[in-house]
């Protein structure tokens, strides 16, 4: 290797080498000034970063907040307050000490003035814990001594006065337990004295009697009950004198002084002794007033006469109407129905037959036009499109030609003349009846296939198609229907040499010859024909 001695020497290069390494490929010496580390100065201080890992143990850890953000401050001075509770316990022992006449008084003082060393929150939780513990102990003691304390009645009177006093903490705890014990006993023994059950039942029964009596008096005017008398209180011999009193009870002229029948005697309490003598004296007077038995029979007949009076108390029938002077009943409901019938059907009422006929004639008459002193009537027949829907079909007038078949006046006719009115646009057709050979004439009617379209229309017959099986010399044919029935001797219309045309088509034999037949009340007539070739069969 070649070694070249450096020409550049600087003071800042403490670790500079005197020789330089040559490149392996070029074999050219590389100067030291190319690298920036060669320009460092000894006067520039160097900074060294050192990372030290250690473990720090704190006295107390916090699970809620960070250790470096926890602060502590002394609590403010608690307020100085105090309470004095004076509990006076009065106990009477009836079972164990019946001869004891004196009362025991016990005064308990409680002072809660000095609580400087306690925190309010801690004291509150401690007080609640003590209260729950004391309640559990009291419940246990009560279960053990419930038989011994059944006759004791405990009354407590507490007077609270706000005045701070000094006392030890042990006295405060003892007074707190005694106070809780006294309060617990007072709450349990307060509801022990109950009223006697017979008094409560008697009051309840009396209230039920009053309620029933008031309700029956409102619903039944003939009901009246005198609670001062009961049949179970009367002697046995008063039963004879009690029968006429029943008749006076149902009579219309009653008075409150009379003896009434008690329907709820089983629920009424017994009256006082002073009222018993009064009721007996009245019963003796009633016995003297009825000397003989026929008077009771007359009273019984009087009861029968007054029986229809009870039907008046029944609710009347809910009828909507009135009675006239002749005693005939007229219903308001039927009158309303008749009024509605007159409004909806003004021409069908039984009092206006002549009006109905005049209106119908005016409707069928149609418009009237006078021309050159001649009165022309145009009759419009609207219901024709709906009368024979199964036997006819509507045909527009611009499709009808002379020789076609139409229904004129309800008869199948062949058209021989057509006339059109330039003013109204109606078509008038004249035709010959195919069965009776009579002339029929009729005008077209207006149909509305769409709301804004008006078309002059006529009715045409519905044709039946029969298969021709044979031809006869008398001008009749034998045909078969679509259901397979065979029709014998069907006549053919004579106009237009139709029979000759059918015979020519049938003799050619190029297809099936079909006859078009119209029906008129069971009579059939062949009016046309058509040939269906073999390709269509």
Swiss-Prot record:
Please note every region of biased composition (Low complexity). Answer: 135-144
This protein's GO cellular component annotations are: porous cell septum; Woronin body
- Gene inactivation effect: Leads to an increased sensitivity to stressors that affect the integrity of the cell wall and membrane, such as SDS, the antifungal agent fludioxonil, the acyclic sesquiterpene alcohol farnesol and the cell wall perturbing agents Calcofluor White and Congo Red. Does not affect the resistance to hypo-osmotic stress but leads to a higher sensitivity to physical damage. Results in the lack of Woronin bodies. Attenuates virulence in a murine model of infection.
Q: Which UniProt keywords apply?
A: Cytoplasm
Q: RNA-binding among the record's keywords?
A: no
Q: Which GO terms describe its biological process?
A: positive regulation of translational elongation; response to wounding; translational elongation
**Out of the domains of life, which is the source?**
Eukaryota
Protein's UniProt keywords contain Cytoplasm: yes
PANTHER family in the record, alphabetically? Answer: TRANSLATION INITIATION FACTOR 5A FAMILY MEMBER (PTHR11673)
What's its job? Major component of Woronin bodies, fungal-specific organelles that occlude septal pores in order to separate intact from damaged compartments. HexA binds directly or indirectly to the Woronin body tether that in turn is anchored at the rim of the septal pore. Woronin bodies are important for stress resistance and virulence.
Q: What is this protein called?
A: Woronin body major protein hexA
The beginning of the lineage is: Eukaryota, Fungi, Dikarya, Ascomycota, Pezizomycotina
């Amino acid at each position: 290797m070649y070694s070249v001695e450096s020409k550049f020497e600087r003071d800042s290069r403490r670790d500079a080498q005197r020789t330089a390494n040559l490149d392996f490929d070029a074999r050219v010496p590389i100067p030291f000034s190319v690298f920036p580390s060669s320009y460092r100065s000894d006067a520039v201080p160097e900074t060294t970063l050192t990372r030290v890992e250690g473990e720090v143990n704190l006295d107390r850890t916090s699970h809620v907040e960070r250790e470096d953000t926890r602060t502590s401050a002394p609590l403010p001075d608690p307020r100085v307050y105090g309470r004095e509770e004076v509990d006076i316990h009065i106990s009477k022992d009836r079972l164990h000490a019946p001869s004891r006449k004196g009362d025991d008084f016990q005064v308990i003082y409680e002072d809660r003035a000095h609580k400087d060393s306690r925190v309010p929150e801690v004291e509150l939780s401690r007080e609640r814990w003590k209260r729950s513990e004391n309640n559990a102990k009291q419940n246990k003691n009560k279960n053990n001594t419930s038989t011994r304390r059944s006759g004791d009645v405990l009354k407590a009177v507490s007077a609270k006065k706000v005045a701070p006093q000094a006392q030890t903490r042990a006295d405060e705890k003892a007074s707190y337990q005694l106070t809780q014990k006294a309060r617990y006993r007072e709450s349990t023994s307060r509801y022990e004295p109950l009223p006697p059950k017979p008094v409560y039942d008697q009051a309840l029964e009396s209230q039920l009697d009053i309620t029933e009596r008031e309700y029956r008096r409102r619903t039944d005017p003939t009901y009246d009950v005198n609670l001062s008398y009961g049949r179970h209180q009367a002697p046995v011999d008063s039963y004879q004198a009690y029968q006429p009193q029943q008749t006076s009870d149902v009579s219309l002229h009653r008075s409150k002084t009379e003896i009434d029948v008690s329907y709820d005697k089983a629920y009424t309490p017994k009256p006082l002794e002073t009222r018993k003598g009064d009721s007996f004296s009245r019963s003796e007077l009633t016995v003297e007033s009825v000397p003989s038995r026929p008077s009771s029979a007359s009273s019984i007949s009087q009861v029968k006469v007054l029986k229809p009076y009870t039907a008046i108390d029944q609710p009347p029938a809910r009828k909507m109407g009135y009675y006239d002077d002749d005693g005939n009943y007229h219903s308001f409901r039927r009158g309303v129905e008749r009024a509605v019938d007159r409004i909806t059907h003004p021409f069908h009422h039984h009092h206006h037959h002549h009006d109905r006929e005049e209106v119908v004639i005016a409707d069928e008459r149609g418009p009237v036009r006078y021309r050159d002193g001649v009165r022309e009537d145009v009759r419009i027949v609207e219901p024709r499109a709906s009368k024979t829907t199964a036997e006819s079909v509507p045909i527009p007038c611009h499709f009808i030609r002379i020789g076609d078949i139409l229904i004129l006046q309800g008869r199948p006719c062949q058209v021989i003349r057509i006339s059109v009115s330039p003013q109204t646009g109606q078509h008038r057709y004249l035709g010959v009846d195919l069965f009776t050979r009579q002339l029929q004439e009729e005008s077209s009617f207006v149909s509305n296939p769409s709301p804004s379209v008006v078309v002059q229309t006529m009715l045409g017959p519905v044709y039946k198609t029969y298969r021709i099986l044979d031809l006869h010399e008398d001008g009749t044919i034998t045909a078969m229907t679509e259901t397979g029935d065979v029709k014998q001797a069907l006549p053919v219309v004579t106009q237009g040499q139709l029979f000759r045309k059918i015979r020519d088509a049938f003799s050619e034999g190029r297809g099936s010859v079909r006859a078009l037949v119209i029906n008129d009340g069971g009579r059939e007539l062949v009016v046309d024909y058509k040939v269906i070739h073999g390709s269509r069969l």
